[in-house]
């Protein structure tokens, strides 16, 4: 409250996704309860590309995230080719696989795994692994001992608690309750 009153802030403008919008809403409600009037405007920016916009109109943030992701993914693919290895990338997107798909498509990745692939079945670690292994086998048959797969983080967010427990994966969670995939540890 002190920051807002000291600086005579009358308008809170936020740019971001769901978490940013909900945080801004909580701030505005807190200030309102303290009898401090403030207007709150939120500009949706999401790399998920999942807002109901006209066909062919990407969300603010998606194109730049896809372009930067494709630069990284191309470099990883070159490393895979020159080293004769396979690499697996994870792309952001808690609830939609658009970014992973866009990156994988731009780089012609042999395997792209997105949550939308599992709309009629439960996502399991075994299914994810089998998809990647099937791609490795197909490429080997074609005479290629290298490759890369991109997996949307939404695939991991959709794992059931039981599946996570069985896998031995230990998640930490951010302040919004989302698993922090960059801080995953394995049970010993």
Predicted regions and their residues:
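Accessory alpha-helical/coil subdomains and C-terminal extensions
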Residues: 3, 14-16, 24-37, 41, ...
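A structured beta-alpha segment of the ubiquitous adenosine-cofactor-binding alpha/beta core
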Residues: 1-9
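Anion-recognition interface
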Residues: 44
């Amino acid at each position: 409250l002190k920051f807002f009153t000291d600086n005579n802030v009358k308008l809170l403008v936020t740019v971001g996704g769901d978490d940013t919008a909900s945080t801004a809403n909580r701030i505005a409600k807190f200030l309102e309860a303290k009898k401090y009037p403030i207007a709150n405007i939120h500009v949706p920016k999401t790399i998920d590309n999942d807002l109901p916009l006209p066909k062919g109109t990407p969300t603010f943030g998606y194109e730049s995230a896809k372009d930067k992701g494709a630069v990284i993914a191309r470099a990883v693919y070159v490393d895979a080719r020159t080293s004769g290895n396979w690499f697996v990338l994870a792309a952001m997107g808690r609830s939609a696989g658009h970014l992973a798909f866009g990156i994988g498509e731009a780089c012609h990745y042999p395997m792209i795994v997105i949550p939308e692939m599992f709309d009629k079945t439960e996502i399991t670690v075994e299914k994810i692994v089998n998809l990647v292994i099937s791609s490795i086998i197909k490429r080997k048959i074609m005479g290629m001992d290298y490759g890369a797969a991109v997996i949307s983080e939404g695939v991991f967010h959709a794992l059931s608690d039981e599946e996570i427990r069985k896998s031995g994966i230990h998640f930490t969670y951010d302040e919004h309750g989302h698993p922090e995939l960059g801080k995953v540890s394995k049970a010993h």
